[in-house]
Structures are given as structure tokens and as C-alpha cells.
Amino acid sequence: MQNGSNVTLIAPRRIGKTGLIHHVFERMKTADKRVQCFYVDVFPTKTFSQMVQFVANAVMGKLDTPSQSIKRKLNNFIAALRPTMSPDPITGAPTFSFTVEPENARETLTQVFEYMKESGQMCYLAIDEFQQVSNYNEIGADSFIRSIIQFVPNVHIIFSGSQQHLLSDMFMSPKHPFFNSSQIMTIKEIDVEKYGTFANNFFKKQGREMSQDVFTYLYNMVDGQTWYVQKILNRLYRTPKEELTKKTVNNAVGIILAEQEINYQNNYNLLTENQALLLTAIAREGVVNAPTSLDFIMRYRLPAPSSVKLALKSLQDKEFVFQTEKGEYIVYDRFFGMWLKRLE
């Protein structure tokens, strides 16, 4: 980022990419107080205009200096955005929120980037779950975004997302506007030994110690996925008098699953019979290479391969199942997978 490159950050959800982005931004702001960093999560957006509204709310008004009048900014940049002004509850400084109409979305996004350009400040913008752009009905939304950002030299962007196949296609396929427009980066699991040492530093402050063997056991339960590891560690940290053993790890996981019982039951009830059968089979298997193979189908009494294929696609679309880089299929939510294994 400091060398002027845009970055595409690809990683499964809950491995820690959002935390990494915020950490990098904090490091950059510490190194240079003049830089401006903005984070926008566009996962909830369904339309291009909603995405533009999210970006506008994150950026507009944040680069003003005390000497710059609100009126000038309203007149020059944001009058068309239907701004609503309110005082910041802590500083008292004016803050803005915006409503973007679909017919004004392109003009608005142009104004947002023009605002950053005119500020003269070095700006870093992270757009998380950027693959949502590919789902918008707006024709040419990705082409327009690319055309805007390439002419703003003081703005550098992190395109982040969790749906690897969509992001890879957007940034690595010659038929898409973002082809070769950024540096592709992926996040892997934290090294188990380094992670164990890091976690143990906190337990030592409680007068306890977790052996590397126990931590590796915990780590492997959830495939080293950061959010799940942290969830278990947090549960263990809240019981400072217990010895840190594999048994206490299992107890902690049991409590977590019990807390989510209603949510998991509701998710399960929303599935069709074929989807539920396949998802449970994948959970019990752990990792599945060929879900439509005769061996797998017979072992778990699944329907015909064509029905399994249809159920698999639906489970992937709903993000119940994730396909790894190796082409293997796993239950996306590791705790949900553990809960499914317990079903009769």
C-alpha cells in the first residue's frame, strides 16, 4: 500500500482479514499521522447505489480541516447527495450522512473520489466483501468503479472479500475490468506454534500455562481458523481457576455450542431434506473430496448424484459449505459443523 499499489485481499470469512486491515491501518497512521484510512463493509448492500452510499458515509466530511467552511464543502461536493448534518457526540464537530438515489449513484461516486483527490491527503480505502459488486443489477458497475479510481493518484484501495471464486474471477480474468489492476494477496492460518506462544502469554498472567500439545489440539479442532480459535481461548480465559487441558477445551466448546443451539437448529430447519442430509454428511466426514462419488453417497445414504450436486450448489450459495483451494468441501462454520456431528 505504501508503495502505491492497490491490493486485493482474499480469505475465507472469520480468518481475520478485517482485523488485519484495521491493524495495518493503525500501523500506517502511527507511522504517518497525515494519512487517512477508511473502512467500508459492503456485504449488506444489494445495489450499486447502496454501495456508493456506504462509501460516501465513510468518507465525506472526514477530510475537512477546521479552516474549511461547511458551506463550501456542501456547495462543491455534496449538495447532490442530500446530506444530513449532525454534531459528533464527543467532539461536537459536524458529521454528515447521505442518501444516494440510483440515478445519481455514478455522479455521487465521482464526487466522493474527487473529494479525496482535492484534499491532497494520502487516502487508503478498504472495501470489504467487494465481490458484492458482481451481484448488482447495475450494468457496468465494475467498469465504472475502475474508471474512477485509476485517475486518483492519492487514493489507494484494498479490495477485500471472502468468496474466493468470485473475487479471483473479478481480478484475475482478462474479461473483467479489474484484471491486473491490483496485487493479489491471500491470508493463511497463523502458524500453530507462534499462535500457541501468543495465547500462552495471556494465560501466564493468570498464573496458568497451556501446553503446546493442548493448544495444537484446540487449533486443529477448528482448522486453525482465527475467529474460532479466539472464541475458544476467550471462553477458557473466563475460567481462570481451571487447568488448561484437552478436557477443559472440550468443555469450553460444549458451552459455545449450547449457547448457539437455537441458531443452529433454526439454520438446520431452513434446509431441504437433501441439503440437510448432505450438510450433515460433510460435517461427519470433516473434509470431502468427491461429494457426488458413489462411495460417499452410499456411506451416508444420500440421494442420486444429480440431487447431491444440486444440494451442494445451494449449500455453497448459502455459505453453509466452503470449497477450499484444494477443491475439498467443508462445513463453513466450524462450530455448526461440530453441532451437526452430534445429531442422531
Predicted segments, located by residue:
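Alpha-helical DNA-recognition elements
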Residues: 27, 144, 235, 314
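P-loop NTPase nucleotide-binding core
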Residues: 3-7, 11-15, 19-124, 155, ...
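C-terminal helical "lid" of AAA+/P-loop NTPase domains
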Residues: 215-221, 227-241, 277-280, 313
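Conserved C-terminal helix/linker of AAA+ ATPases
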Residues: 215, 238-260
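C-terminal leucine-rich, beta-strand-based interaction scaffolds used for sensing/assembly
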Residues: 258, 262-344
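Sensor-1/coupling segment of RecA-like P-loop NTPase cores
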Residues: 117-124, 132-137, 144-175
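Helix-loop-helix "sensor" segment of P-loop NTPases
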Residues: 169-220, 242-243
